[in-house]
From Swiss-Prot:
<comment type="similarity">
    <text>Belongs to the UPF0246 family.</text>
</comment>
<dbReference type="InterPro" id="IPR005583">
    <property type="entry name" value="YaaA"/>
</dbReference>
<dbReference type="Pfam" id="PF03883">
    <property type="entry name" value="H2O2_YaaD"/>
</dbReference>
<protein>
    <recommendedName>
        <fullName>UPF0246 protein SSA_1395</fullName>
    </recommendedName>
</protein>
<dbReference type="GO" id="GO:0033194">
    <property type="term" value="P:response to hydroperoxide"/>
</dbReference>
<dbReference type="GO" id="GO:0005829">
    <property type="term" value="C:cytosol"/>
</dbReference>
Length: 242
């Protein structure tokens, strides 16, 4: 079993530092390709100012040289979903659950354990980087599939941007989740609701040590409850009345 969550654009640059593991060959290849760009090229690629592109180029060089600051991924990312995940005061059982089951999908690092030390970076799968003539998604597909080859059940809190990196064979094992608000006359979904709910849902999984679908159906978190009438075998739907 694995639980997958995506990276986030927002970062907590004060997260506690950690010693990194040696980078994957794919990570090194991506960094080498990024390092071929000029400051102007990086500014255009990332759609940022030349001043920020200069800082980004220095960060890429530090990563290649092994001098970049690293922090556990779960603490480094600080988007809306992450801010709604319990990330401190873990019990021993909660820490073991995270280490065993939770993984983060990255366009630079691949599929990594949630507490893997990584460096701040901007790269995502929507960016038009080519490696050996392949898109980032195509470049990472084999490594992504290998990372989950032994997992029969995969709980995905990913967007389609990340899910489509995996082959169809792997995606068929995934169970996805949808979070809706019931406003009386209609069910509503938008990114803010979804991101907050994903974090709250993951917290419920961690604190309740959930490993099976039947356990998930019984969860009640942040006002959300499971709705079997809206769910399917590959998508579980939770609704909050507001």
């Amino acid at each position: 079993m694995k639980i997958l969550i995506p990276t986030a654009k927002e970062l907590n640059l004060t997260a506690p530092s950690a010693i990194p593991n040696p980078p994957l060959a794919q990570t090194q290849a991506v960094l080498d390709e990024l390092a071929t760009m000029s400051v102007a090229g990086l500014a255009s690629f990332y759609k940022i100012s030349p001043e920020r592109a200069e800082i980004e180029l220095q960060a890429i060089q530090a990563l290649r040289e092994g001098t970049a600051q690293h922090a556990p991924a779960l603490y480094l990312f600080d988007g809306l979903m992450y801010r709604h995940i319990k990330r401190q005061d873990y019990t021993k059982e909660e820490s073991q659950y995270i280490e065993k089951y939770l993984a983060i999908t990255s366009a630079l690092y691949g599929v990594i354990p949630a507490l893997e030390p990584i460096a701040p970076h901007r790269l995502d799968f929507m960016m038009p980087l080519k490696l050996d003539g392949k898109s980032l998604k195509a470049f990472w597909k084999e490594a992504y599939d290998q990372a989950l080859a032994e997992d029969e059940v995969i709980f995905s809190l990913l967007s389609s941007e990340f899910e489509t990196v995996f082959s169809k064979k792997i995606r068929q094992r995934m169970i996805g989740f949808k979070f809706l608000e019931d406003r009386g006359d209609k069910l509503k979904v938008h990114s803010t609701i979804s991101k907050k709910a994903r974090g709250e849902f993951l917290t419920a999984l961690i604190t309740n040590q959930v490993t099976e679908v039947e356990q998930m159906k019984k969860l009640n978190f942040a006002g959300f409850t499971y709705r079997p009438d809206l769910s399917s075998e590959q998508e579980m739907v939770y609704v909050k009345e507001v």
